[in-house]
Amino acid sequence: VGSEMCIRDRSGVCRATNKPVSEFGSRRAHGPWAAVYGAKAAIIAGCAGTSNILTGSIFGCGSTGTMAHSFVSSFGCTVEGEHKAFDAYIKTHLGENLILLIDTYNTLKCGLLNAIRTFKENGIDDDYPYGYGVRLDSGDLAYLSVEVRIILDENGLHNCKIFATNSLDEYLISDLERQGARIDCYGVGDAIATSKAAPCFGNVYKLVQLDGKPVMKMSEDRAKMINPGFQRTWRISKNYPEELFKIDVTC
């Protein structure tokens, strides 16, 4: 299995025109140790890093990662809340690589602007001795990456890297490259950690309530938007028990 993953991972790395590819598949792997050894196989195949900290600890390979949408939402579903999240993250991880997730609400109208503002407030610029950048996780990645690059350069952040994730595989990466995307590094999860023959269940964690207060993740991709507040799942059936269920509704 490890050798097969190496072959697939190497294919993904090569199709990304030699840009760094990081393994982000732990949450979708078929068990905790599958995640650990799958990440190891990805590193052997040529991935630049893995989000699996245990793999990095056991095998001495580089671990990498950013932040979750739930982290951003936990500071409040407002533009200022996003800024507070970025500021807290930078202050906590100062002296390390800093990658800010900018698509929790709106990539160009607030996420990127908050990232630039927070970088500058904390003295993060092209003289920062570690890596710094922003991550895109939804929307038209090719278009957004071009626009983000223009705005970053206009603000003097020429060394700020653009990372991209969102169910990527070697084919999507190749397509992004053909479109002229200004992406510096790709994060690949499902396509590395699982196979087409035994794929993953495409569920994700979204924060909907914190300390009794509803929170909501906005997105330019409507499929990624959620209802705020505590919810229950209702199973609807026309002819129970003959017909076990027809649809599940969360509200």
Question: Where in this protein do the model-derived segments appear?
Answer:
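Buried, small/hydrophobic-residue-enriched core segments of structured protein domains
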Residues: 1-4, 8-158, 168-174, 178-179, ...
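Hydrophobic/aromatic residues located in beta-strands of well-ordered beta-sheets
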Residues: 98-100, 162, 186
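Gly/Ser/Thr/Ala-enriched C-terminal appendages of enzymes
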Residues: 150-155, 160, 168-251
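Short hydrophobic "strand-cap" motifs at the C-terminus of beta-strands
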Residues: 165
